[in-house]
Structure formats: structure tokens, C-alpha cells
Amino acid sequence: MLNRIIEHMNAHHVEDMKGLLKKFGQVHHAENVAFKSVDPQGIVIGYNHNQTLRIEFNHEVKDPKDYKNAIIELCQSVEKTHDLKGVEEEVKAFKESFDSVCLATLHPNGHVVCSYAPLMSDGKQYYIYVSEVAEHFAGLKNNPHNVEVMFLEDESKAKSAILRKRLRYKTNARFIERGAEFDKAFDSFIEKTGGAGGIKTIRAMQDFHLIALDFKEGRFVKGFGQAYDILGDKIAYVGDKGNPHNFAHKK
């Protein structure tokens, strides 16, 4: 079976392998490209006479019969990497799947606070709901333009601990007075979550504040060789500037 895979890749998929070398190894001019081996963790491609690059699968292949699908998934990822419209839709859906968000804030005394807060949205604007007694409140109040938020995939849903999908934004925080905007945001939150677990109770607590999150530039990482910079409504593939990682190309 392994010999058939190697023969097939070398006979029919040299261009696909060149795409993989470019995406995962920053190899822009590859010659004498050859598929060398495959194992449950990944593949090895040879190029330029005496060099090789190992590329890991997104998840371990348990059955050798599934090598074909794992290799196809790798090859298809090259084209999908440049499907920026698809990435834009994925970013939107990823954000909408969260009811809380990770925060990094700068406390007035200079130390950084890492925390999380419940997340609300009216369909266009995102908000967090924060108590004055929370440690991150002082940072949001005193340094509202020095905030980062992160949407981080649940580890139990990720293909690997090092492949957790994440979306991070530099963010401006704006405090919203209680009124029409407050009610619209909180009504949407209750509708989405069902309002259980104390959510309806904290709505009336006056030491809690609704804070709008105005996202600035960000980065979306969805897997190996799949990082994207975000600025407003524009998305750019990081790899277009050259792969940022250094690889050990074996001879």
C-alpha cells in the first residue's frame, strides 16, 4: 500500500507537492520533487536533489487505509488557504459561536491581567458585561485603548493541543450607558443563552457595566500554515510574505 501511494504521488501530484513545500516550508523554487514516505503523523517530501521536508497531518492517522484522505486533506488545504472569502465567513461563524471571550488588560499599576468575560452581540456590535469588582475592570476603565480579546477554540474540540483555532484582536473598549443600546444587547444575550445561571439576575446589578468592543487589527490562526491578518474588512494570508517559521531542511 505504501509503495502504491508513493508511486501515485510521484506520477500524478508533483505540482501539489510543490504547493505543500511552498506553504509549509517556504520553498518557492523546488526541483526534483519526490514523495518519500508517509506514516501516521505525516509525510516527507524530497526536493532539490538532497533536501527533505516533513509535513505533519492535522491529526494522527489510525488506519493506513486513511492515508489517502489525510494526504488529500493536506493538498486541498493549499488552495483553501487562499480562499479569503471562505476565511472571512469562517471568522464570522467562529465569533458567533462564543458566549464568552478571553481578555488581556493593562492594570493601572502596570501589570497585565488575563481573564474572561461574558460576550454579547446585537448582530453587528460585540460587548462584554463586567463587574467593578472584577480584576480586569480597572484596566478596561483606565486603559480602554490597550485591550486584547481572544476567541479560543475549546481544547476538547481541537484536532491537537497545538492546533486550537484562535482569533485575536487589538481592541478599544467603550462603556455604554443603560438605555436602548444596553437593552438590545442584553435581550440578545438572554435569547441566545436562555438566561439561566444568573444571567437575568446580574442585568439589574448597578456595579456591572456593558462595554462595547471595537475591534481593530487582528489575527486568525486555523492550523499549520494557515494564519491571517485582519484589518477592518480586509483579510490577508500571512504566508504571502513568506512562511514566518524556520524549518530544519534535512540533507
UniProtKB/Swiss-Prot annotation:
This protein's UniProt keywords: Cytoplasm, Heme, Iron, Metal-binding, Oxidoreductase, Virulence
Major localization class: cytoplasm
Keyword Iron among UniProt keywords: yes
Assembly behavior: Homodimer.
Record flagged with keyword Cell wall biogenesis/degradation: no
Protein name: Heme oxygenase HugZ
InterPro entries according to UniProt: DUF2470, F420H2_bilvrd_red/Heme_oxyg, Haem_oxidase_HugZ-like_sf, Haem_oxygenase_HugZ, Pyridox_Oxase_N, Split_barrel_FMN-bd
Principal EC category: oxidoreductase
Substrates-to-products reaction catalysed: heme b + 3 AH2 + 3 O2 + 3 H(+) = biliverdin IXdelta + CO + Fe(2+) + 3 A + 3 H2O
Assigned protein family: Belongs to the heme oxygenase HugZ/HutZ family.
Residues annotated as binding heme: 245
Disruption phenotype: Deletion mutant cannot utilize heme iron for normal growth.
Induction, as annotated: Down-regulated by iron.
Gene3D superfamilies: Electron Transport, Fmn-binding Protein, Chain A, PNP-oxidase-like
Any one GO CC term of the record: cytoplasm
EC number: 1.14.99.-
GO MF terms, alphabetically ordered: coenzyme F420 binding; metal ion binding; oxidoreductase activity, acting on the CH-CH group of donors
